[in-house]
Each structure stands twice: as structure tokens, then as C-alpha cells.
């Protein structure tokens, strides 16, 4: 949803409330994530204020409906959040490990000019890997993913294991 469009916000808020109320007693829900990858967060000050206000309002509204943590924007451009989440699809395990190093007391973020500063929240990589691969094909129009696709199942598992080990 384009959070800078008042009609989108007007439609999203009641639908989001109904989702939280409907599912708040479900035992498998450990956190609420109203937004994913808010790439449309503008650099323009006025539009950025609208975006941030929408995120802040939905965060507060979610907390008013349930006690669980709220991950405001999964992956990037956090405004107010109980969980610090990032998405990283680096395909080289060594580069991923280097990216994850805490520098100056900060976990990595996608864009320091757009993200609020990290404030000690639990840190999650909630998306990674995304390995491009179609069994038996080096490249295919139907394949989707990141990096050069592996040539064998063994190469796929080796890359996945390397990326996972870099995180752990």
C-alpha cells in the first residue's frame, strides 16, 4: 500500500484492525508486522512525515489491540519498532558475515538516512538467501532470485549452508 495516499491509509487501517482482532488469540503469532519493505518511503520531508505518521499510528493502534511486539516495517526503513529486522540477499557468505558485524554499537541498516537509529531492539534477519535456481537449468526465464544460480543440488546446499552459518 502506498502509505502516502490518504485513500490507501483509510482503507488499510480498518482492515488491519480486523486482522489483529481476529487473530490476536492465535498461539502461533509472536509479533505483528503491518508493513513489509517500505521502499516507497520518500526522501521529501513532507511526504516522509506522512509516511512516518502512518507507521507510528498503525504501531500504536496495533499495541492498543494486542500485547505482542510490533515489527513496524519488516526489512527496512523502521520508524518505531519493537524488533529490528533486516532483509539481506547477499549470495557470498563472507560478505554477508562482514555486513552483519556490529559497527560503532549499531547493527546494519539499509539506509541510515531513512531508518531511525537502532535502539537496542532484538535483531532479526527475517529474509535471506533468495538463491536463484531451477533444477537442472543454469538459467531459465522462469527462475527468480539473487546472484548466479547454482549448477547442482550440492552447490545449492553448500551456498545455503554458508549463508546460514554466516548468520549464526
Where are these regions (language model features)?
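Substrate-binding/catalytic cleft of secreted carbohydrate-active enzymes
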Residues: 1-168
Amino acid at each position: 500500500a502506498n502509505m502516502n495516499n490518504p485513500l490507501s491509509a483509510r482503507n488499510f487501517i480498518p482492515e488491519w484492525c480486523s486482522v489483529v482482532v481476529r487473530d490476536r488469540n492465535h498461539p502461533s503469532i509472536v509479533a505483528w508486522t503491518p508493513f513489509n519493505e517500505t521502499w516507497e518511503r520518500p526522501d521529501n520531508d513532507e511526504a516522509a512525515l506522512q509516511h512516518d505518521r502512518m507507521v507510528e499510528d498503525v504501531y500504536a493502534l496495533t499495541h492498543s489491540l494486542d500485547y505482542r511486539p510490533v515489527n513496524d516495517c519488516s526489512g527496512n526503513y523502521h520508524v518505531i519498532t519493537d524488533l529490528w529486522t533486516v532483509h539481506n540477499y547477499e549470495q557470498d557468505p563472507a560478505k554477508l558475515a562482514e555486513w552483519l558485524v556490529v559497527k560503532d554499537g549499531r547493527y546494519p541498516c539499509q539506509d541510515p538516512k531513512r531508518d531511525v537509529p537502532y535502539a537496542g531492539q532484538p535483531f532479526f534477519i527475517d529474509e535471506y538467501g533468495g538463491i536463484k535456481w531451477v533444477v537442472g537449468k543454469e538459467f531459465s526465464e522462469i527462475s527468480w532470485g539473487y546472484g548466479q544460480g547454482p549448477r547442482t543440488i550440492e552447490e545449492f546446499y553448500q551456498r545455503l549452508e554458508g549463508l546460514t552459518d554466516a548468520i549464526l
